[in-house]
Amino acid sequence: NSSLASKNYDYDYDSIQPYFYVDNEDEDFYHQQPGQLQPPAPSEDIWKKFELLPTPPLSPSRPSLSSIFPSTADQLEMVTEFLGDDVVNQSFICDADYSQTFLKSIIIQDCMWSGFSATAKLEKVVSERLASLQTARKDSAVGDNAECPTRLNANYLQDPNTSASECIGPNTSASECIGPSVVFPYPITETPKPSKVAPPTDLALDTPPNSGSSSSSGSDSEDDDEEEDDEDEEEIDVVTVEKRQAVKRCDPSTSETRHHSPLVLKRCHVSTHQHNYAAHPSTRHEQPAVKRLRLENSSSRVLKQISSNRKCSSPRTSDTEDYDKRRTHNVLERQRRNELKLSFFALRDEIPDVANNEKAAKVVILKKATECIYSMQTDEQRLVNLKEQLRRKSEHLKQKLAQLQNSCLSSKRH
């Protein structure tokens, strides 16, 4: 048991760290313990005690089909070792002595290090144990002897997040166990509650959470989460909240699992024409009649499209219909305001007094336009009168010219 405990204690990172206190408080802290490294001296920097370990490597991926279904020679060899040697059985079974040693270890009592580096290491060990246990169970099914599988501990096959119940042997009482809430008060990742334990034939298909590969039942939800993360980086025009229906998936076994996804943000785009009223107008000429007809046609198309969508789609609630009406009204109102603004700009450019004043108010533009119209009408009347006077003068001169020509001809005859 001591050799087994020392061998399995390798994944406890505290055994190789010189920055932790010794379990026995009566011993001298600065006294070098046998089998441990030299603790830091008082002159060293105190902050070195709180340095975090580098990021641990990722957990191994799911075992391949070759490891799940070994060859016939490998099956016979593993069956003989599994049935003949008791030491091999102890690699799959955690007895009471080792469980007590594991519960007394610093990695369980220290919540900080249990939440960081040791979790990935424990998950790696659990995934390896699951793969080896699956192979051993299939090999034991080949031989008709069912004596040793009765000692297998089913508690070890549960979720690795239930830290204390991973390696509790069948002889360990419930009072010696440590609750997950005591060891890990703050969970690292939010994982769904584990369902009932599946039959032993399906154990190799499930991998521990936070591992490098995902199970087949949760692949769709993880892909959806990745797509949502990509969409969050883009600009969302309108966000609506929808609740997904429960998706039913049938596993290769007879068990059926139902997955409920939380509220999901769905992206919707509203085709509205936005205009920056503070920007400088690009053109100062009034729009021709052709462009106005195009705008009217586009607005009528919007109305027809919305009405056709209402007819084709399923019956909506009154709130959705009101929202469509408001959206259509806003689009048409925005177009009307744009046309009115362009008309004021064109009128301002025709008035000499405010032609160069880009910040002229609409009231000033209208007043100056009225004054300009009155002055233009006065000038027009004056010019009309002048034209009439000039016409009369030209007729009088023509008559005088005709009289002079007649007098000249009469003088030549005499």
UniProtKB/Swiss-Prot annotation:
Domain of life, per lineage: Eukaryota
The entry's keywords: Activator, DNA-binding, Nucleus, Transcription, Transcription regulation
Motif (9aaTAD): 77-85
Residue ranges, compositional bias (Basic and acidic residues): 240-259
Acidic residues bias (residue ranges): 220-237
One Pfam family cited in the UniProt record for this chain: HLH
Transmembrane helix is among the record's keywords: no
Disordered: annotated span: 192-263, 296-330
Cellular compartment(s): Nucleus
Known role: Transcription factor that binds DNA in a non-specific manner, yet also specifically recognizes the core sequence 5'-CAC[GA]TG-3'. Activates the transcription of growth-related genes.
Domain comment as written in the entry: The 9aaTAD motif is a transactivation domain present in a large number of yeast and animal transcription factors.
UniProt name for this protein: Transcriptional regulator Myc
Native source species: Oncorhynchus mykiss
